[in-house]
Amino acid sequence: MTPEILPIEQYDDQLAEKTERLRGMMAPFNAPEPVVFRSPVSHYRMRAEFRIWHEGDELYHIMFDQQTKQRIRVDRFPAASELINRLMPELLAAIQPDSVLRRKLFQIDYLSTLSGEVIVSLLYHRALDEEWQEHARALRDSLTAQGFRLQLIGRATKTKICLDRDYVDECLPVAGRDMIYRQVENSFTQPNAAINIQMLEWALDATAGSTGDLLELYCGNGNFSLALARNFERVLATEIAKPSVAAAQYNIAANQIENVQIIRMAAEEFTQAMQGVRQFNRLQGIDLTSYQCETIFVDPPRSGLDDETVKLVQAYPRILYISCNPETLSHNLQTLSETHDIRRLALFDQFPYTHHMECGVLLEKRQ
């Protein structure tokens, strides 16, 4: 696989290999057969980052080969959305003749949406002044005139300049309802929008007919908690990153959802609060004891759940666990399977043509 050529003809074989690998990893836990969700074979990534190479008067996107560390020129990138592919040549064509915009530009980040918006972040090894802003505004205006709905951001050491705003609003069709999600530049968002929709719909199906409330740890911009809110009386969700919490609060209002409460704290802190070990000012006005959380949802980082959080999670009758690293999931399941059975297993091909796997399990406590 090169950045410009995807081995599309190998997609089915690669997905079959991942499915087999997941089966093997989940076999010790008596997991059911995985339901497999395919990715689009191209234009599936909603974001991309490129280094910028300067050669004489020319300017082009590059990536580095992970094995050889050689640089590879990238003029088109079929893994990324069609919107990013349309924008890449137009953006460089506009920057190339402009000495102010190109000077010490070393990286460009793209974040696009299915709703047709895109954020472009230009990263520099120099201070950005008023002259840069003037040229950047002209660049934004010329690309807008070409039909691109874009936000332009300049970054340098300890500097972030937004010409307008640093977010885009995504709209995802989820089980018959359009969900609005504000996505903030440089914050985590699911990279594969088509797979994200399938993950949300799978989670909705897995929790259909639920009783009581839902607790979610690591909620990000509310991706799962807002979609799942329709299946529960109330949802209590935690997140540590300030921009994500702000986006989640906006998303609650934009989707007119009234049964979701977001708390800004780490999962480890929340564990202490639930156990009564510590009191937090941030929890004033929130009566944790009033929540009847019978289901807990976790979508942890690659490192998985720490031991204390595993113990917290184990107390709940139903656990919905989305994992971007089945190895740490397996490690967590060694403890969780002492008390819970896996009722559902899913493989989401979030990262085609790589060895990475995303999967989901629904666990229920043994009676």
From Swiss-Prot:
The keyword Transcription does not apply. It catalyses: uridine(54) in tRNA + S-adenosyl-L-methionine = 5-methyluridine(54) in tRNA + S-adenosyl-L-homocysteine + H(+); uridine(341) in tmRNA + S-adenosyl-L-methionine = 5-methyluridine(341) in tmRNA + S-adenosyl-L-homocysteine + H(+). GO terms for cellular component: cytosol. It comes from Pectobacterium carotovorum subsp. carotovorum (strain PC1). Belongs to the class I-like SAM-binding methyltransferase superfamily. RNA M5U methyltransferase family. TrmA subfamily. The active site is at C324 (nucleophile), E358 (proton acceptor). GO terms for molecular function: rRNA binding; tRNA (uracil(54)-C5)-methyltransferase activity, S-adenosyl methionine-dependent; tRNA binding. It comes from the Bacteria. This is tRNA/tmRNA (uracil-C(5))-methyltransferase. It holds the Pfam family tRNA_U5-meth_tr. Signal peptide: none annotated.
